[in-house]
A protein has these predicted regions:
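P-loop NTPase motor module signature
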Residues: 1-428
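Short acidic-hydrophobic surface loop/beta-edge motif
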Residues: 105-106, 183-185, 563-568, 572, ...
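Extended active-site and interfacial segments that coordinate phosphate-rich ligands
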Residues: 126-142, 296-299, 319, 353, ...
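Charge-dense polyanion-binding interfaces
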Residues: 136-138, 247-252, 257-263, 428-452, ...
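Short hydrophobic alpha-helical segments that form membrane-spanning helices or hydrophobic packing faces
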Residues: 417, 577, 769-773
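Acidic, serine/threonine- and proline-rich low-complexity intrinsically disordered segments
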Residues: 439-572, 578, 583-754, 796-875, ...
Length: 894
């Protein structure tokens, strides 16, 4: 194993100006560069500067927090410069710290630092940002778990917040961040209001008809189509480009390099053009010459269900529609907006809403952060309520894996948490040998094989059967060997690639160039965190390397695990369609959930397949667990041992025992005592004890809980004391375990309580009584059929020593419970469906046997079900009685 530094590269120069600084939190690395350029510009005329410049400077100089809500193109980012001048002065020293540009010796002198959400969360977590600092949150509406943690940690540190947002309802942020004012600005020009139409279709290809495209060509329009998936962007661009060669078509999504959009961003794209993009791709891009927007009314978002994030297809919210339409609505003369939806959307009535938060779906990140700081999740004022069940589940998992102990990170946990990777990859890096570091680090740098490749990929020569991880590794290794080499970016070593060669390589294989470049960036960051030199080349995948990788996974197992498409808790999970793993066997990797067309959450997994013998070797063998099996009458006390692997039971062995294992003698006595208390023990005193227990429980109810309760827990403790010194099952069978009722209630008290009436006479018939405790009050319930309910008179009821309640039996239907006859009649007259919806019905069979003393059989004066028969003939008979009667009829002897 290698030594893991406990200080990340971003914190190796922790100093800061004495008077505080401005920390700008950007959503992406690209946004960091944009903000850095914007802070360096002066004298730029913008909508915000023209309409609210003096107001922004006044608020910035007063020291209070505030927000700016404005649409795209109004100059939100450029407003950071005048804000900084009011707070830190005109001598601005600005720098960027992110995964690409680490901290330098000059970092402590910067009075304006631009960081990504991950760096900001780390600095807040380690107290490198204090109350003297001001946080500017750019694009705060782009919610993420990291950003939401930054907001909570910033509030805990006492920081001042200035936030910039696109068109959303600002009421939440105003209250949550204690903002003095919110400046709202818009570049909307009523004279340039777009024509907005809703097309009754959700298929963009159906909408892009010949008529529409001829309209685009005739007017030489610039069209942007926003769709929810990467595949849709490529499909649209391909379909239109093949049919209409006079329309310049292009697509863009998160897997493509930003250089692909250069003609559109710089106004060099020839009209007419059509650009298909994912909704996420449109956020901070100003496309020149755009006058037509087509919006597919769909988005894939993570919805938290039962503590797990489920990828769900939902209609777009008002915020998303307004932001996309705002590209042309009120900004471009003759603009057109088309919304492809089967819903009825009244565009003029759409109003901004509060953003959707993501933190509830990442309880593990919250647990690690809180453990590092030594605080509880309750101590953080999170912007969204945390799923407590999922949070506690994450804490237990982290404790079991040795990362958390006593609500603090262990030494192992600190090594894992400091690395710039997710927790599973951090564990693998900490526990791997140095020769496997290149494999682990690169696999950690690639999001997934599915996100790395297109649907029509051609990667057969690189497939490592049974491992998506190693297949992705092999693709990067080949790209580096053929298209790249060692280089330097911002003075830091990194794998760099020839753009043209890499583009051709990716096009030939169906691999996304952006994923390769992002992997190179992440790989360099990981090696800097490990303080290891970045290798010039990577070893190819061979059988020994594959076996070492599998052994590491089997030994550490930080991922989800599925065996034969089933989880340890019995949930069915399918192998991902794009995975190179087989359906059967052991697969370890990332388990993701998605919502199918019926709304049901389904799981899929991709990762690496492991041989059974590897997990067998790594499985834990329990020393044996004492169990009590009532199904084994001769020897119910048994010793069970099992071979388990992270929740899966691979094998088990069970054998009968007589002598108690010395280290489990107390557990054996507890199990036997529990069996005696529940009445399932095979002991000579068990039968008589069951009768006494039933009587003691009835006495407890009749006494109004004045006597000692004979619950299962109390009886278990009683028999544990009686079994003290017993060391084998044979001694247990010989022990005197007859229940002494006098220890629970004196004999005279038991006799008095059992003399209380067990039945009540109403209208000449007797009905059973049930004694009970309800809301701390002793009551007695009369069980009567529904037809008797309407014959009773409240004034003619006998006096009882406690309140009389009613249970009305209604044949095969659910019974009714009421505190009075009037209430019982009112409930009985209401529709059953209404009572069921209000939870006023109880399952209580009409043939329930009453306490001892209650008369059984048909009531006096009422015929039995056997019409015309004698009363004795209508009663049930035993099989032995019927057999003797048949024998007599045949002339046999009795």
């Amino acid at each position: 194993m290698i030594q893991i530094p406990t200080i990340p590269p971003s914190e190796r120069y922790p100093g800061r100006p004495a008077d505080g600084r401005l920390v700008v939190i950007a959503p992406t690395r690209a946004a960091c560069e944009t903000i850095e350029l914007g802070v360096g510009l002066v004298g730029i005329e913008t909508v915000i500067e023209r309409e609210h410049g003096s107001e922004i400077r006044r608020l910035a100089s007063q020291g209070s927090g505030f927000g700016i809500v404005a649409g795209t193109g109004t100059g939100k980012t450029l407003a950071i410069r005048p804000i900084a001048e009011e707070i830190v002065g005109t001598q601005i020293r600005v720098g960027v710290v992110n995964r690409e540009r680490e901290a330098t010796p000059e970092t402590p002198t910067w009075n304006v630092v631009i960081v990504t959400t991950g760096i900001a969360r780390r600095w807040l977590q380690d107290d490198l940002i204090g109350p003297e600092d001001t946080l500017i949150v750019d694009e705060i509406h782009q919610t993420s778990a990291e950003l939401e943690l930054c907001l909570a940690l910033g509030k805990r540190a006492g920081c001042r917040f200035i936030w910039l947002s696109a068109t959303v309802d600002p009421s939440f942020y105003r209250e949550y961040l204690d903002s003095a004012e919110v400046i709202e600005s818009s570049a909307f020009d009523p004279a340039k209001a777009a024509t907005v139409r809703v097309a009754n279709t959700t298929n963009p290809l159906n909408f892009l008809s010949e008529r529409f495209l001829r309209h685009v060509m005739k007017e030489k329009r610039g069209v942007a189509i926003f769709v929810p998936t990467r595949a849709s962007t490529e499909q649209i661009a391909s379909a239109v480009g093949e049919r209409w060669d006079r329309i310049f078509t292009q697509f863009y999504h998160g897997g493509e390099p930003i250089t692909k959009l250069r003609p559109f961003l710089e106004g060099e794209a020839e009209h007419p053009y059509l650009l298909s993009m994912t909704a996420a791709g449109q956020s901070a891009l100003n496309i020149q010459g755009l006058d037509t927007v087509v919006i597919e009314d769909a988005q894939f978002t993570t919805v938290v269900r039962g503590g797990k994030g489920v990828l769900t297809r939902l209609p777009l919210g008002a915020n998303e529609i307004l932001q996309m339409a705002g590209r042309v609505h009120g900004r471009v003369a003759g603009g057109e907006v088309w919304i492809l939806s089967e819903r009825e959307i009244d565009f003029p009535s759409l109003k901004p809403t509060e953003p959707n938060f993501q933190l509830a779906g990442d309880p593990e990140r919250v647990a690690m952060t809180c453990a590092d700081m030594g605080v509880r999740a309750d101590d953080l004022d999170l912007p969204v309520a945390l799923d407590r069940i999922a949070y506690q589940r994450s804490v237990r998992m982290l404790e079991e894996r040795g990362l958390i102990f006593g609500n603090r990170l262990t030494e192992y946990g600190r090594k894992v948490e400091v690395l710039p990777v997710d927790r599973p990859w951090g564990e693998l890096l900490v526990q791997s040998d140095e020769k496997l570091i290149p494999v682990v680090a690169l696999c950690a740098s690639i999001e997934s094989l599915h996100r790395m490749t297109r649907a029509d990929r051609r990667i057969e020569p690189y497939i490592v059967p049974g491992s998506d991880h190693l297949t992705a590794y092999a693709l990067y290794q080949d790209a580096l060997q053929n298209c790249g080499g060692m280089g330097s970016v911002y003075g830091l070593p990194r794998h760099v690639f020839n753009p043209e060669a890499l583009a051709d390589w990716g096009e030939e294989r169906g691999v996304l160039v952006r994923s390769v470049e992002d992997a190179a960036l992440a790989l360099a960051s990981i090696y800097r965190s490990l303080e290891l030199p970045l290798p010039h080349s990577l070893p190819p995948v061979r059988k020994p390397l594959e076996a070492e990788w599998q052994r590491l996974l089997a030994r550490v197992m930080p991922f989800d695990i599925v065996i034969d498409e089933e989880t340890a808790w019995g949930e069915e999970v399918r192998v991902s369609q794009t995975s190179v793993c087989g359906r059967w066997g052991v697969i370890v990797g990332d388990l993701r959930y998605f919502s199918d067309r019926t709304g049901r959450a389904r799981g899929s997994i991709e990762g690496t397949q492991l041989p059974h013998d590897m997990i067998w070797e790594a499985a834990a063998v329990s020393g044996g667990e004492v169990t009590y099996d009532p199904g084994q009458r001769r020897s119910p006390l048994r010793l069970r041992s099992a071979r388990t692997y992270f929740g899966f039971e691979l094998d088990s062995d069970e054998r009968a025992i007589d002598s108690f294992p010395p280290d489990q003698a107390d557990e054996a006595r507890r199990l036997l005592s529990q069996a005696m208390a529940s009445g399932v023990a095979y002991h000579r005193a068990a039968k008589e004890n069951r009768l006494r227990i039933r009587e003691l429980r009835e006495i407890h109810r009749r006494s109004g809980a004045a006597t000692r309760e004979a619950g299962e827990g109390e009886l278990t403790d009683y028999f544990i004391r009686r079994l003290e010194g017993v060391r084998s099952y044979s001694e247990f069978m010989d022990a005197d375990l007859e229940l002494d009722a006098d220890e629970w209630a004196p004999r005279a008290e038991r006799k008095r309580l059992m003399a209380l009436p067990s039945t009540i006479e109403l209208e000449g018939d007797e009905y059973p009584l049930d004694y009970a405790m309800e809301d701390g009050e002793a009551v007695v319930r009369a069980r009567i059929p529904e037809k008797v309910l309407w014959q009773l008179d409240e004034n003619q009821l006998p006096d009882m020593d406690r309140p009389l309640r009613w249970t009305v039996l209604r044949g095969k239907r659910e019974a009714i419970r009421a505190a009075s006859l009037e209430e019982a009649r009112e409930l009985a007259s209401r529709p059953r469906a209404e009572l069921r919806s209000e939870g006023l019905l109880i399952e209580e069979p009409s043939s329930r046997t009453g306490p001892s003393g209650a008369r059984k059989g048909p009531r006096k004066g009422v015929k039995s079900k056997g019409r015309g028969k004698k009363e004795s003939e209508g009663r049930s008979e035993s099989r032995g009685s019927r057999r003797r009667q048949r024998h007599k009829k045949r002339g046999g002897r009795d």
